[in-house]
Amino acid sequence: MILDPLSPNIENHTQDEIIEFWEKTESIANIPKENLDESHVNSSLVAYLKFATDSYKVFINTDRDLYRMSLILLESSLFEFKKEFCLSKLQSLLNIDLLEMNMKFIIVYILLCEAKKNVYSLEIMLKFQGFTVFYNTLYTQFAYLSKYGKERTVASKHQYNSNNSSTGTSLDSLDRSLTDIDLGIIDEMKQISTVLMDLLFQIMKYCKCVIANLQIVDDFFVYYMMESMRSDTMDDMFNNAEFKLLLALNEQYMMFAKEYDIENKVYKYLINGSVSRCFTELLLLKFNRASDPPLQIMMCKIIYLILTPRGDYSPMNFFYTNDLRVLIDVLIRELQNISEDEEVLRNTLLRVLIPLLKNTQLSKTHYRKDDLNKLLNYLSTLDNICVDSPALHEHQVTVALSRKCLQQIPWLETPSTPSDGGSSVSSNNTSRNSSIVALGTPDNQNILARKGHLYSNRELDVSAESLTKRKAKAPPPPPPPPPSRKCGTPK
């Protein structure tokens, strides 16, 4: 929920007043078709935003009210016939630094609703520099929160801990240096930030970003999200939005690393245990409970980075032994339960399994050796994983990766080699007499080295300092907000 359901309404209204409010809201948005020129659309859109802003926390008090307000605009003739103009206008208003906080929130919420209602609208937003607008607006919130929101975060963490203990300082004493107005501003900024982070996540999930988007992301932006992460809650929307955006950013860095020598700023702070401790704890919790395949794949990619040695960094002692066992348990469970139509996810999980068994303490403890042998040998046979459907490229990759894992991990059983010397899977899907794929054949090497492979370009070293070196340095100070843009009120 974006709005706090426990916060009291500022005013109580009769049923007639509520009906009158929503009727007036609809009348502002639904202008006659003959008045759909840009001048009328502009004035009506601004009038709608002002009316919604003035009614926020007066008539608009719940998530349901907020969504209804957004939907009235998004389904109106005003928006449907002039969608590009409306989206560009909404984004231009966000560029006004001194725009009222509540109006900023209303605008970003409307944009997020439209993005989730119609993915194509994300492309329109990008056309009008949406990534830069959202990033700069979010950056400004982060710069303020890093300076004034730290005590509020400490207070929230203490409140959580005090609920589980009999002693401790009260929340009020931790918040004593912040006035009620300060706390209100911090909460409003977190609300706006939550929506903006979700918008950026949607862009990275569904749209093709360009390298210029990543180049404007600086160290402070990534550092703030990583350092302010909490692992004591799974339900905090701000925290969850930070987590998802870091996953999406990391995925973008990995994709662009195939073509560009670009520093992965997520990885840079990820291997610094003093900064990423809470993020890593939350990662393990969410990886164990995740049910959304795209999010699972994003988590796999970041776990893969952690488990891969680079430069001075070694993953051998990054995770505790119990955490490693949890990872193995989750991987075995997921690999067994994945349906045939989610074979890409199984491919990704297998790519994580290899460095997990090879580069961590599991290489010495041999945890669940028999279960791993049984599972990997089963997945090494093509007929086992696509019984009722034709063999696809993803099925062949599953077989190849399973055999690769058995061959590369010394303490696992090496799979038997077919008597014909290692023939590959026949291109004819109706004839699969050779059910085990041999990794030694050129065809199967191409499967793993194909252009666009998830972890191709492994030789490209990510520019990041070792954990030991970075621990000795103080974290970078938060920079000031971006240079002020043209200020004023919407016209």
From Swiss-Prot:
Residues 414-435 have a biased composition (Low complexity). May be involved in protein-linked oligosaccharide phosphorylation since the deletion reduces the negative charge of the cell surface. The modification Phosphoserine is found at S7, S463, S466. It comes from Saccharomyces cerevisiae (strain ATCC 204508 / S288c). GO terms for molecular function: Arp2/3 complex binding. Keywords: Cytoplasm, Phosphoprotein. This is Protein LDB17. Signal peptide: none annotated. The keyword Lipid biosynthesis does not apply. Belongs to the LDB17 family. GO terms for cellular component: actin cortical patch; cellular bud; cellular bud neck; cytoplasm. It comes from the Eukaryota. Residues 413-491 are annotated as: Disordered. The keyword Phosphoprotein applies. Pfam families: SPIN90_LRD. Its main location: cytoplasm. Residues 474-484 have a biased composition (Pro residues). InterPro entries: SPIN90/Ldb17, SPIN90/Ldb17_LRD. PANTHER family: NCK-INTERACTING PROTEIN WITH SH3 DOMAIN, SH3 ADAPTER PROTEIN SPIN90 NCK INTERACTING PROTEIN WITH SH3 DOMAIN. Present with 329 molecules/cell in log phase SD medium. GO terms for biological process: actin cortical patch assembly; actin cortical patch localization; endocytosis.
